Amino acid sequence: MDSEFFQPVYPRHYGECLSPVTPPSFFSTHMYTILIAIVVLVIIIIVLIYLFSSRKKKAAAAIEEEDIQFINPYQDQQWAEVTPQPGTSKPAGATTASAGKPVTGRPATNRPATNKPVTDNPVTDRLVMATGGPAAAPAAASAHPTEPYTTVTTQNTASQTMSAIENLRQRNTYTHKDLENSL
């Protein structure tokens, strides 16, 4: 018998067959988890951008509709210890010694009506109308035909020189156009 048939047969490149198998990389094993996390982050970012842009749109719409109400810091002290003066009036609900009480309604200003004609400026038109400028014109025309508007005189000369910004400050609500025109 030949001993050839009983000899084990070894492959020529025995080292290649017994080389250790490398483990898969981190990305290949967790690829789907990483992709899902990226998609979720993108969705969250898109939702946040949408929410903030809608807030900006709502704020812009509120400015356009002129519905913004500003707080009057002088409202509580506005009529505290004020003595009534001839030719001026206070709003309903305002008392002379009510420090700490909020004043309701729009206060009347001490601004005298001018002899200038009414312009197309909505802020000054409203201020003149609040002081009785155009409303006093018919009464003034009958009393003094040459003077279309009456001039209110008060004892307090500082109130006669009140600016338009101070008049706006005394109001409870302002519109966007009021603020633009007061600058």
From Swiss-Prot:
Residue ranges the record marks as coiled coil: none
A Pfam family reported for this protein in Swiss-Prot or TrEMBL: ASFV_J13L
UniProt topology in membrane: Single-pass membrane protein
Start and end residues of each stretch annotated as Disordered: 81-157
A single BP term in Gene Ontology: microtubule-dependent intracellular transport of viral material towards cell periphery
Entry's Gene Ontology cellular component terms: host cell; host cell endoplasmic reticulum membrane; host cytoskeleton; membrane; viral envelope; virion membrane
Alphabetical keyword list: Apoptosis, Host cytoplasm, Host cytoskeleton, Host endoplasmic reticulum, Host membrane, Host-virus interaction, Late protein, Membrane, Microtubular outwards viral transport, Transmembrane, Transmembrane helix, Viral attachment to host cell, Viral envelope protein, Viral release from host cell, Virion, Virus entry into host cell
Start and end residues of each stretch annotated as Interaction with host DYNLL1: 149-161
Upregulation: Expressed in the late phase of the viral replicative cycle.
Low complexity composition bias: residue spans: 130-143
Skewed-composition ranges (Polar residues): 111-122
Location(s), subcellular: Virion membrane; Host cytoplasm, Host cytoskeleton; Host endoplasmic reticulum membrane
InterPro entries noted in UniProt: ASFV_p54
Residue ranges crossing the lipid bilayer per the database entry: 32-52
Function: Inner envelope protein involved, through its interaction with host dynein, in the intracellular microtubule-dependent transport of viral capsid toward viral factories. Seems to induce caspase-3 activation and apoptosis. Plays a role in virion morphogenesis by recruiting and transforming the host ER membranes into the precursors of the viral envelope. Involved in virus attachment to the host cell.
Family, per entry: Belongs to the asfivirus envelope protein p54 family.
Subunit annotation: Interacts with the host light chain cytoplasmic dynein DYNLL1; this interaction is critical for intracellular microtubule-dependent virus transport toward viral factories.
Protein name: Inner membrane protein p54
